[in-house]
Amino acid sequence: MKKELLKLSILEAHNCLKRKEFSPTELVEAYIDEMENENLNAFVTKTQDIALEQARKVENLLLQGEKISPLAGMPIGVKDLFCTAGVRTTACSDILKNFVPSYESTISQNLWNNNACMMGKLNMDEFAMGSASSYSCFGPVKNPWKGPYGEDLIPGGSSGGSSAAVAGRLCIAAIGSDTGGSVRQPAALCGIVGAKPTYGRCSRWGMIAFASSLDQAGVLTRTVEDAAIMLQAMCGHDKKDSTSSPVDVPDFLKHISYDIKGKRIGIVREYAIPENKERECVSEMWAANLKYLQDCGAEIVDISLHHTKYALPLYYVIASSEASSNLARYDGVRYGVRREGESIDDMYELTRSLNFGEEVKRRILIGAYALSYGCYDAYYDKSQRVRRRVMQDFDEAFKKVDCILTLTTPRNFIGMDEKLEMIDRYYSDVFTVPASLAGLPAISIPSGLTKHGLPMSLQVIGKHYDEGEIFNVAAVIHKRTGDLLKHLHHF
């Protein structure tokens, strides 16, 4: 019985709870059993007692005949980037290894207000800087999927703990963060759904900052409907966050009608299918999904994003610049684990050089250089001006189409032991970064299997505040694909 509970989506589990087919405690206990035996290194802090206490609260509500939220009693994982009151929050960095916040992030509080159950904090790349979830002071995360020869695969990043936990059935859904693709890319590599809303939809209060003009909370789930339910609870104006949007949040779930007749879906002519060993499989998947969308009544429209080729380099200039500023606070005095030195300068130097990982230090240096005297105009200022051109390209495209369809990642699997140049690691975000720069909502959905039986994915990008549109198109694609997790050998 317990194993069967792990196969349910949020919507299915919610309906079962209302029919009293099982209790919230039984649902949480099923995930706790699975979590205790996990070997993915997905969780860095486990909060089983808190989850059970929250589940018992939902049981009491049901016994009293109260109406419950779709998230009530649902076992949720939280990326270790979001502050959780009384529960260690580290951003998977040595510099914050002992930090226990006294307050709750708005995003997680919104979930607990809906009576969701916190299973624990999830592993990630340090300060959300990475695409493999290998830059963590707690060690790398494993993808539940295995490679063609049984080798371990990366789960993507930086929300790799979140994607691995959902795909590995250690929680029913998880919160992640998406700065340049950190929800969508790991969702793609783990064969699940990953969505980020319009920039400003979700409050950043209590979310440890990486790049403030790009950071946005997102969700990782097994179905598009579940993503809509999660974001419905998470989104909303927050007066504690100056970048929070006051735009009303509609009922995302009601937008999923599975009717796309007459919808115009844009295909970007600058995005060619990458030249690699998976090209044939990806080409077949791409063609099959385009035909399916046309059969469902959608119109495929050719569009151009002229400046998209600059998106990746300008993203790394802007994000690294903002990171160098945001991470200046971790000096051992204001924040962070202190390393003693003979002088205050020694203390600063030792604290930051010994407590930050190599990738974080690399990006701080890139950012500090881009912001330095003599380089600011050539790098940071120019990047911001080109960013405006990227946004304008999307504005022009959306005059012709309702949404845009792309691949999510240039590769469908990467071995944990595979040696990649840094440029190749950064290239894994090539399809996801443009939407982040423009602050647009986007969702990654499973779209098929490679010849090796590994997941492939597509990304749908929408207009500002039009999450309902991308949820509906994504749901149509996911209906064709079905649940890829049933192909995982241990399920």
UniProtKB/Swiss-Prot annotation:
- From which residue to which does any coiled coil extend? none
Would the keyword ATP-binding turn up in this protein's UniProt record? yes
EC number, UniProt record: 6.3.5.7
Q: Name one GO cellular component term.
A: glutamyl-tRNA(Gln) amidotransferase complex
| Swiss-Prot/TrEMBL catalytic activity | L-glutamyl-tRNA(Gln) + L-glutamine + ATP + H2O = L-glutaminyl-tRNA(Gln) + L-glutamate + ADP + phosphate + H(+)
User: Which positions carry the signal peptide feature in this UniProt record?
Assistant: none
Enumerate the Gene3D superfamilies for this protein: Amidase signature (AS) domain
Q: Which GO terms describe its biological process?
A: translation
Q: Which residues form the active site?
A: 79, 158, 182
Under InterPro entries, the record lists: Amidase (IPR000120), Amidase_CS (IPR020556), Amidase_dom (IPR023631), AS_sf (IPR036928), GatA (IPR004412)
Offer an example of a GO molecular function term for this protein: glutaminyl-tRNA synthase (glutamine-hydrolyzing) activity
* Keyword list, A-Z: ATP-binding, Ligase, Nucleotide-binding, Protein biosynthesis
What general EC class does the enzyme of this chain belong to? ligase
Q: State the PANTHER family in the record.
A: GLUTAMYL-TRNA(GLN) AMIDOTRANSFERASE SUBUNIT A (PTHR11895:SF151), TRANSAMIDASE (PTHR11895)
HAMAP family xref list: GatA (MF_00120)
Q: Which family does it belong to?
A: Belongs to the amidase family. GatA subfamily.
Q: What does this protein do?
A: Allows the formation of correctly charged Gln-tRNA(Gln) through the transamidation of misacylated Glu-tRNA(Gln) in organisms which lack glutaminyl-tRNA synthetase. The reaction takes place in the presence of glutamine and ATP through an activated gamma-phospho-Glu-tRNA(Gln).
| Assembly and oligomerization | Heterotrimer of A, B and C subunits.
What protein name applies here?
A: Glutamyl-tRNA(Gln) amidotransferase subunit A
